[in-house]
């Protein structure tokens, strides 16, 4: 029936009592007449009421009253507006249960009924207007008949919670209607409009009941006063209630009634059932009892709530069922074909045998009951619908399934149905005797005040129960009926649908069709008759009541099977450990044992740790003596609302665990770490055994303590006893300070986390005097500022055997002091010192930068005859600095004290399986006579070391100290051969468990759904297993939830991650599910209710529910208490420095956190609320637990702030619309590890030390401090996995480029096959910047986070096939290119052009190399612009170097955090082997391109350009760059070189003087093109040189020859290895005697002659910057008779070989060590770094290249000239500039024969000889030499004519 908005509605519902708690019920007051009371008008402001309704709740007539728009101004003192909303089409129905009465015709009946039972109900509420109060009193009952009228207009249903009341001043605008999710605002209806409509609709019978309003409105004459005793509230705590509108009226004027409760146990016998078994061996008809039955028991712990000694409700806290033993009867079936029929049993132990209850459709239909899949009941409008009436002849036994349902005692005579005039009203028919007055515990329904928050969906037992008040003295035990209790028995087989009088149990399964609205006067009332005996156990079927004759339509339906829902509880699953804490004297302490039962147990609490879920804090409810495994222990019980524990597959209330009783005194065998420490400190010479695994957390060290046991331990400690191995867990400092002649055996130290400023080791700082350490194993982390050893720092004449260390060692502290770091021992010293049959699995981060700073995989320093044998190391050593003594086995072996080889350290049968940065494989320092035998290393290990070559630092693969190199396939077997050591299995701590959730024993478990249960467990982390199985069975088999494993689920509001659930629980609308394969899906999420402090959500249309891994907890008290302390912390304070572990003199600059630190402090309150919400669960409000959290934060405030600042600084970036910072900081379970504490993790991060928090160490910091807690491998796999989840359709690089503000240019090759490879995202071929800087071979992977978090565009990045360049915009900033758009355009345009040049250069190399060389071009060379930044006033180039503390954004946000401290010098640029650094030159300039080809040659020649053969011994890096493989500086360079990078334009001004290739990308398509070009170029060179030579020998005098010519010789200097085979070219003047020999062209070759024009006297420095002049002949063919040629002759011959045989077959064999093996076979060897190498000689190369064609290089040179001479007759005609004429004349000369050219050459040679300017200091051939000018003109003409020598000049083209 549709109700009208203005109709009065009277609500009586016990459910509302549970919400309000302050209504008053007063009985035995009678009023003669019907009274309606208006509100008292006593206010100074205007009252406005907003009531929210939906358009479905109003009638068509009322819809016509809707006014569009919003209310504007109030017109009266008190007005009501009905705000109408329409439900959006995509929103779900949100209808509250129908519990109200809207039938005005029933009021009289209600009055008569209340008269009969003597019940008066007062509803008291208050409105406060300034200092005055409105008191509305609703009075019910009369003697002869009464009418109850409510004074307020009808509250709506669906949107009730939005109702609001405002006070506004006259003329003030009204508030706007609120926005409601899922609804659209329509308009409003004024209250007066409704009243007018209602005036026309009041029934006659109600009009007759009206009284004189004038009399009733004399408000001042009415004085209603109600008094309550306030004293009754002392020491009582009322449960949590979200709405308490009555409190205001009661405060000070009306006392509150006491709500009390007590707890009691109720025991009910469970009758045993009878089972009939067929026995084929018994004769048919024979019956015998096989087993006698035994009754069971159901024990319920019930909490009874009372007000004024009257019970108002009860709550079943726990139910324990002791199963009944069924009676088993055997029936014989022998010779009978038909088996006997089984009787129906009622055994509760076997609920599947319980016959179904019939569906109930009688009275009480207003209770909250919606059995699953039950068809809607017809609306009931008969007599006393909702009253407690027992139908005739129905005597059901209520128990088991129906236990706790609302029942009626047998003695009450049921009222007959009334069908008269006022059917539905509460009346007493004439023939029916009145019911006796009811005064039981629930007499009096409670009116619901306005604006009550909607009730959540009921999904489990006791929903809606009153929250437990704290410490209430229990009332006397109640043993009466359990009517009204909300009970759902645990895992009981579904009862049949019941249609009798008791339908109305409060159970509402999901997706059930709604019951018809009950409109009777007591709909929803829950009333218990007085003094009703407990109902008997239900043991069988209940027959449905016979329908009334006069109401044949109310026919009982057929029984329908109903499945009983499992009881929903809180269960802590997968418990791994339990920790007990206490508060005493303001300090918190962890207890691993107890001395006695504490008297102040309220100061104790427990932290329950799980292998899968968050820690849970629980208050202690009891500690009692007990035994476990025969040992006396303490049984400790912790409690929380609805918490149960699975004990042997049975649930028990609360959570219990056991704690050891601390032995008062232990002498030899120890089960307490504190006892052990105390005993050893008292007697350092005793013998001690572990009798259990010990927890070092038991001992709290003093500040500054360096170890647990002080002094020199000379006794014995054994970690095993009676065949069991034990461990000591959680050491925070070394166990011993010093071991002296001591013995430690069979001991394991697990989870060590040790830090210290001095030298440290996990077991001891030092072991000396023949100490024996055997079978000792350590795992964990050690961090220090100086020496570190995994076991001991220093072992002096002591033995370590069969021992191991596994973990991380961190020491990146920068100091000049010497130190030693080793995986097992830092320093091993003395002839009796030994490490044998041991191993280390390590990750070492160090900063060693001098030879006295040693780092080794097994030991740092091994000296004084100490020995390491039969041992190996595996893992990684990353030494950031370059010059320390670092190696995979031992860092340093030399004995510094004696400086004698015979006392050096020794290595025997050792193996290095370690990747080493800046070190060697076996030993870090090489010298002759090393005492190393049988050493091995892994070929696949990356071992790099830097060396100084000339003035450049070059990083290259270390070939020193590699030992015997094994293939990776041989490593495992070699390790086993060396030793087969493995760590023993040890006993766990007493409080540790490994109990995993086992769903297989849960009812309805399906093995095929194991993964579904595992996934639901993630979605419901705190619910019991039965609930998980229930929802696991609802997972659809075609859903992803059924097929893939969930790692985590994250709540979101659209794309925003929600962390603080308590503050945003209703805002969440999406659930992001992250699967193990890193796929994800978003499901719709809808908040539906709370269950025991858990917010419960509906997941889309799946039928599933979700609860976050958080309890609803308000942390404001904690936040408010710690906030002042945190905000008082100063970044530059000593407290911060102490936390970082640095002195006051150390700058904090390189942390780059100061700016973020201030921002973090500004938003601390919000951050802390999120952090605490994401952290450990506080299951029950407890001041001791809160204090523990407060204490932890205050004690670690500096570390917490540093950790928060660090994460907010480096992880503030997005994946699309999702910011990852909150995921990293708060959702550390995102990758599946649900038991991580974000608070602890962030504190530990902040405490991890200065070096770990350095910006440049951000990759290691994640891997060390965050990866394990996030269940991830490393930073980059984490970033990639985030991308897979949030941006699955993009590559990592695409995401990266969208996120970074750096300007990125990725220039792919112009070669198709290369470009295709480069487009392979994530491959080694990719030129994606992200792909490259995250590769394992990239040295500066720490660039990723700075690039992702840059706040502005200040850096550019250029990526090409072989290099990755970085530079700052401000490097190009000056007064011509000012900051802003102008500078940006200049930089970005030039960055693109530079990228193309670099691309072209390596396309050139790709085309001329073979397949092996081409593959090596796919690499990653770092290129850096200088740290020289200009401003808008800078002229030309900036010249001042910026330091790391510069405020320049490029330095502040990128270069500084990356931490590459580039050494700046006066060079144009320099290379280090893996990097290129521009200095004077700039990357984006044209000369920067030429510099690129030079420096990249240094980084490419050894492994790539030279075919992988390496540089020829004796040739320095500069030999291969300048004048050989780099591009010429300018297009007019008159040198023999090849332009490989710059494209010139025919229209350029420089075209007339260009002597180099116009466009290398077109000229060189393959190696043959290169050979063709050089060969044709040498046609011109050889021809012109021949002509000049002929002019010299034929035209010049001997004196002129002396001036015009020089000769070249070799000299040899012995090097550091004793070699004197590397030639240095020396240029000398020729003598007259020499000149006299020069009478033919060949004589110039034979006498090693060269031109004096551009070659000056003196030594041609080896490894120098030399070029071969294009127009100054070198006739000589000088070779090195001993070995390697000099720099000048080497370059010239190299190019001549390129012209003759090509790059691969001519040049490469000459300048590389290609023929080294041949040299060895020929007995030509040299020593390099103590190793014998083959010496490649010129003669060997000549013989191999030309296959014996030439006997010497002179013959080769003569042949080359002769080859061209033979073609002179075919010389092409050519026209060139006539250099004899002034250049302004533009005269040209054409020649067709060589003879013509010879004539011109003769003239030029004579002119130069006559001028004789060769020795003039200002002599420049291009201006002062006629020969030079002529040659240049001819060369240029032929260059142009042949289109860059695509054709020969000898083609007889006339």
Swiss-Prot record:
Residues 533-570 are annotated as: Disordered. Residues 552-570 have a biased composition (Basic and acidic residues). Residues 38-99 form a propeptide. The active site is at residue 1495. It is a multi-pass membrane protein; Peptidoglycan-anchor. The Gram-positive cell-wall anchor motif LPXTG is located in the N-terminal part, in contrast to such motifs in other known streptococcal and staphylococcal proteins. The protease could be cleaved by the sortase and anchored in the membrane via the two potential N-terminal transmembrane domains, whereas the propeptide located prior to the LPXTG motif would remain attached to the cell wall peptidoglycan by an amide bond. Inhibited by EDTA. It is found in: Secreted, Cell wall; Membrane. InterPro entries: G5_dom, GLUG, LPXTG_anchor, Peptidase_M26_C_dom, Peptidase_M26_N_dom, YSIRK_signal_dom. It comes from the Bacteria. Its cofactor is Zn(2+). Keywords: Cell wall, Hydrolase, Membrane, Metal-binding, Metalloprotease, Peptidoglycan-anchor, Protease, Repeat, Secreted, Signal, Transmembrane, Transmembrane helix, Zinc. Zinc metalloproteinase which cleaves human immunoglobulin A1 (IgA1) in the hinge region. This is Immunoglobulin A1 protease. It comes from Streptococcus sanguinis. The gene is iga.
């Amino acid at each position: 029936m549709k109700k009208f908005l203005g109709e009065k509605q009277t609500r009586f519902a016990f459910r509302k009592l549970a919400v309000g708690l302050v209504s008053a019920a007063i009985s035995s007051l009678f009023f003669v007449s019907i009274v309606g009371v208006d509100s008292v008008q006593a206010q100074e402001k205007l009252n406005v009421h907003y009531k929210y309704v939906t358009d479905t709740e109003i009638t068509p007539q009322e819809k016509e009253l809707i006014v569009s728009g919003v209310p504007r101004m109030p017109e009266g003192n008190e007005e009501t507006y009905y705000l109408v909303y329409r439900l959006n089409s995509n929103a779900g129905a949100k209808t509250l249960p129908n519990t109200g009465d809207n039938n005005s015709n029933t009021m009289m009946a209600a009055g008569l009924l209340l008269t009969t039972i003597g019940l008066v109900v007062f509803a008291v509420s208050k409105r406060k207007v300034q200092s005055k109060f409105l008191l509305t009193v609703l009075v019910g009952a009369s003697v002869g008949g009464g009418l109850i009228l409510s004074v307020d207009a009808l509250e709506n249903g669906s949107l009730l919670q939005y109702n609001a009341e405002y006070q506004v001043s006259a003329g003030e605008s009204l508030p706007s209607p609120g926005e409601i999710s899922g609804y659209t605002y329509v308009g409003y209806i004024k209250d007066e409009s409704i009243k007018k409509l209602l005036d026309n609709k009041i029934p006659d019978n109600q009009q007759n009941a009206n009284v004189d309003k004038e009399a009733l409105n004399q408000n001042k004459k009415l004085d209603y006063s109600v008094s309550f005793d306030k004293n009754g509230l002392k020491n009582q705590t009322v449960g949590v209630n979200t709405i308490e509108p009555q409190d205001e009226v009661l405060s000070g004027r009306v006392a509150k009634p006491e709500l009390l409760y007590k707890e009691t146990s109720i025991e009910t016998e469970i009758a045993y059932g009878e089972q009939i078994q067929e026995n084929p061996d018994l004769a048919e008809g024979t019956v015998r009892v096989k087993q006698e039955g035994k009754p069971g028991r159901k024990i319920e712990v019930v909490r009874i709530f009372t007000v004024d000694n009257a019970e108002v409700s009860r709550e079943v806290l726990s139910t324990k069922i002791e199963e009944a033993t069924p009676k088993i009867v055997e029936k014989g079936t022998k010779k009978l074909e038909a088996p006997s029929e089984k009787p129906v049993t009622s055994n509760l132990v076997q609920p599947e045998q319980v016959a179904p209850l019939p569906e109930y459709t009688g009275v009480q239909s207003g209770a909250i009951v919606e059995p699953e899949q039950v068809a809607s009941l017809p609306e009931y409008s008969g007599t006393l619908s909702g009253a407690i009436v027992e139908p005739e002849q129905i005597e059901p036994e209520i128990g088991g399934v129906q236990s706790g349902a609302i029942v009626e005692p047998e003695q009450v005579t049921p009222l007959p149905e009334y069908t008269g005039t006022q059917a539905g009203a509460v009346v007493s028919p004439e023939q029916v005797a009145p019911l006796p007055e009811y005064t039981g515990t629930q007499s009096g329904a409670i009116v619901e005040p306005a604006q009550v928050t909607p009730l959540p969906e009921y999904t489990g037992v006791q929903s809606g129960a009153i929250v437990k008040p704290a410490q209430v003295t229990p009332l006397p035990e109640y043993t009466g009926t359990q009517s009204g209790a909300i009970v759902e028995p645990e895992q009981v087989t579904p009862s049949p649908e019941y249609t009798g009088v008791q339908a109305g149990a409060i159970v509402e399964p999901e997706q059930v069709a709604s019951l018809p609205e009950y409109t009777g006067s007591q709909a929803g009332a829950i009333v218990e008759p007085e003094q009703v005996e407990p109902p008997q156990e239900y043991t069988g079927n209940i027959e449905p009541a016979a329908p009334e004759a006069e109401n044949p339509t109310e026919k009982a339906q057929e029984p329908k099977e109903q499945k009983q829902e499992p009881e929903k509880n809180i269960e802590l699953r997968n418990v791994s450990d339990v920790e007990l804490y206490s508060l005493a004297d303001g300090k918190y302490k962890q207890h691993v044992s107890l001395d006695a039962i504490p008297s102040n147990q309220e100061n104790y609490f427990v932290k329950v740790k799980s292998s899968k879920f968050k820690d849970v804090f629980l208050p202690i409810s009891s500690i009692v003596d007990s035994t476990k495994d025969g040992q006396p222990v303490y049984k400790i019980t912790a409690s929380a609302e609805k918490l149960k524990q699975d004990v042997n597959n049975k649930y028990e209330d609360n959570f219990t665990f056991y704690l050891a009783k601390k032995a008062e005194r232990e002498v030899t065998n120890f089960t307490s770490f504190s006892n052990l420490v105390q005993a050893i400190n008292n007697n350092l010479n005793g013998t001690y055994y572990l009798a259990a695994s010990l927890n070092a957390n038991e001992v709290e060290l003093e500040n500054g303590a360096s170890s647990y046991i002080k002094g020199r331990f000379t006794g014995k400690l054994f970690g095993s006893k009676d065949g069991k191995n034990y461990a000591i867990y959680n050491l925070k400092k070394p166990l011993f300070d010093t071991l002296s002649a001591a013995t430690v055996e069979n001991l394991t130290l697990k989870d060590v986390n040790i830090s210290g400023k001095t030298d440290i080791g996990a077991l001891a700082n030092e072991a000396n005097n023949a100490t024996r350490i055997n079978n000792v194993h350590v795992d964990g982390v050690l961090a220090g500022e100086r020496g570190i050893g995994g076991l001991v720092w220093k072992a002096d004449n002591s033995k370590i055997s069969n021992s191991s260390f596994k973990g991380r060692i961190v020491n990146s502290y920068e100091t000049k002091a010497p130190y030693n770091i080793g995986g097992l021992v830092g320093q091993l010293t003395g002839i009796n010192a030994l490490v044998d049959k041991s191993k280390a699995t390590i990750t070492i981060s160090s900063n060693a930068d001098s030879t006295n700073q040693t780092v080794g995989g097994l030991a740092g320093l091994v000296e004084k005859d100490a020995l390491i044998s039969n041992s190996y190391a595996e893992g990684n050593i990353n030494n950031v600095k370059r010059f320390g003594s670092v190696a995979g086995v031992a860092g340093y072996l030399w004995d510094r004290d004696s400086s004698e080889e015979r006392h050096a350290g020794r290595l025997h049968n050792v193996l290095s399986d370690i990747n080493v940065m800046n070190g060697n494989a076996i030993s870090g320092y090489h010298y002759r006579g090393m005492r190393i035998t049988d050493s091995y290393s892994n070929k696949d290990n990356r071992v790099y070391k830097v060396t100084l070559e000339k003035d450049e630092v070059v990083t290259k693969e270390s070939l020193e100290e590699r030992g015997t190199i094994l293939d990776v396939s041989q490593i495992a077997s070699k390790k086993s051969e060396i030793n087969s050591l493995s760590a023993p299995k040890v006993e766990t701590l007493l409080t540790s468990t490994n109990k995993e959730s086992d769903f297989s024993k849960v009812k309805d478990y399906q093995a095929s759904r194991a993964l579904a249960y595992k996934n639901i467990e993630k979605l419901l982390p705190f619910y019991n297993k039965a609930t998980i199985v229930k929802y696991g069975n609802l997972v659809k088999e075609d859903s992803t939830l059924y097929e893939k494993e969930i790692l985590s689920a994250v709540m979101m509001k659209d794309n925003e991650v929600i962390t603080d659930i308590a503050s945003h629980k209703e805002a969440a609308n999406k659930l992001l599910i992250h699967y193990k394969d890193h796929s994800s899906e978003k499901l719709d999420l809808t908040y539906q209710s709370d269950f025991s402090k858990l917010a419960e959500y509906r997941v889309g249309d799946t039928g599933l529910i979700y609860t976050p891994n958080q309890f609803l907890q308000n942390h404001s008290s904690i936040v408010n208490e710690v906030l002042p302390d945190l905000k008082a912390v100063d970044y530059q304070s000593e407290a911060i420095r102490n936390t970082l572990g640095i002195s006051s003199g150390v700058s904090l600059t390189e942390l780059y956190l100061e700016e973020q630190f201030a921002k973090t402090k500004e938003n601390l309150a919000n951050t802390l609320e999120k952090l605490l919400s994401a952290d450990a669960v506080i299951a029950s409000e407890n001041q001791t637990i809160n204090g523990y959290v407060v204490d932890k934060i205050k004690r670690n405030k500096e570390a917490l702030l540093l950790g928060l600042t660090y994460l907010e600084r480096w992880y503030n970036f997005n994946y699309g619309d999702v910011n990852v910072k909150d995921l990293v900081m708060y959702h550390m379970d995102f990758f599946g590890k649900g038991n991580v504490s974000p608070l602890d993790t962030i504190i530990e991060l902040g405490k991890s030390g200065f070096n770990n928090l350095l910006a440049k160490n951000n990759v290691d910091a994640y891997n060390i401090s965050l990866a394990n807690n996030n269940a991830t491998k490393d930073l980059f796999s984490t970033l990639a996995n985030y991308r897979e989840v949030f941006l699955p359709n993009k590559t990592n690089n695409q995401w990266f480029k969208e996120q970074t503000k750096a300007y990125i240019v990725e220039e792919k090759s112009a070669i198709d096959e290369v470009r295709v490879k480069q487009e392979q995202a994530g491959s080694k071929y990719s030129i994606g910047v992200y792909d490259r800087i995250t590769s394992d071979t990239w040295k500066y992977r720490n660039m990723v986070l700075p690039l992702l978090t840059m706040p502005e565009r200040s850096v550019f990045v250029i990526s090409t096939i072989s290099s990755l360049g970085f530079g700052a915009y401000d490097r190009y900033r000056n007064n011509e290119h000012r900051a802003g758009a102008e500078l940006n355009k200049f930089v970005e345009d030039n960055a693109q052009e530079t990228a193309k040049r670099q691309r072209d250069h390596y396309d050139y190399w790709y085309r001329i190399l073979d397949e092996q060389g081409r593959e090596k071009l796919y690499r990653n060379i770092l290129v850096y612009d200088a740290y020289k930044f200009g401003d808008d006033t800078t002229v030309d180039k900036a010249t001042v170097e910026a330091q790391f503390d510069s405020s320049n954004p490029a330095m502040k946000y990128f270069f500084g955090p990356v931490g590459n401290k580039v050494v700046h010098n006066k060079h144009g640029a320099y290379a280090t082997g893996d990097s290129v650094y521009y200095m004077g030159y700039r990357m984006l300039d044209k000369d920067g391109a030429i510099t690129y080809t030079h420096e990249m040659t240094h980084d490419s020649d050894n492994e790539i350009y030279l075919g992988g053969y390496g540089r020829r011994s004796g040739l320095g890096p500069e030999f291969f760059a300048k004048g050989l493989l780099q591009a010429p500086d300018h297009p007019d360079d008159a040198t023999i070189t090849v332009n490989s990078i710059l494209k010139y334009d025919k229209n350029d001004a420089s075209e007339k003087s260009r002597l180099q290739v116009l466009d290398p990308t077109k000229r060189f398509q393959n190696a043959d093109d290169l050979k063709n070009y050089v060969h044709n170029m040498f046609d011109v060179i050889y021809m012109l040189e021949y002509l000049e030579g002929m002019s010299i020998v034929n035209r010049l005098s001997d004196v002129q020859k002396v001036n015009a010519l020089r000769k070249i010789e070799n000299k040899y200097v012995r090097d550091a290895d004793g070699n004197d085979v590397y030639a240095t070219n020396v240029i000398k003047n020729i003598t007259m005697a020499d000149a006299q020999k020069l009478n033919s062209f060949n004589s110039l070759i034979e006498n090693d002659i060269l031109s004096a024009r551009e070659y000056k006297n003196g030594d041609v420095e080896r490894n120098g910057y030399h070029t071969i002049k294009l127009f100054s002949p070198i006739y000589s063919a000088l070779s090195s008779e001993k070995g390697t040629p000099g720099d000048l002759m080497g370059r010239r011959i190299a190019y001549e070989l390129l012209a003759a045989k090509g790059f691969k077959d001519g040049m490469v064999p000459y300048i590389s060590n290609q023929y080294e093996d041949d040299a060895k076979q020929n007995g030509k060897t040299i020593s390099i770094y103590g190793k014998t190498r083959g010496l490649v000689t010129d003669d060997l190369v000549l013989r191999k290249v030309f296959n014996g064609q030439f006997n010497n290089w002179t013959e080769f040179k003569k042949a080359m000239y002769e080859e061209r001479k033979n073609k002179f007759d075919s010389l092409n005609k050519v026209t060139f500039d006539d250099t004899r004429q002034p250049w302004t004349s533009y005269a040209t000369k054409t020649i067709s024969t060589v003879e013509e050219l010879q004539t011109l050459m003769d003239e030029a040679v004579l002119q130069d000889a006559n001028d004789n300017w060769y020795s003039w200091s200002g002599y420049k051939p291009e201006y002062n030499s006629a020969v030079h000018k002529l040659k240049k003109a001819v060369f240029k003409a032929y260059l142009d004519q042949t289109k860059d020598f695509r054709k020969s000049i000898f083609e007889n083209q006339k």
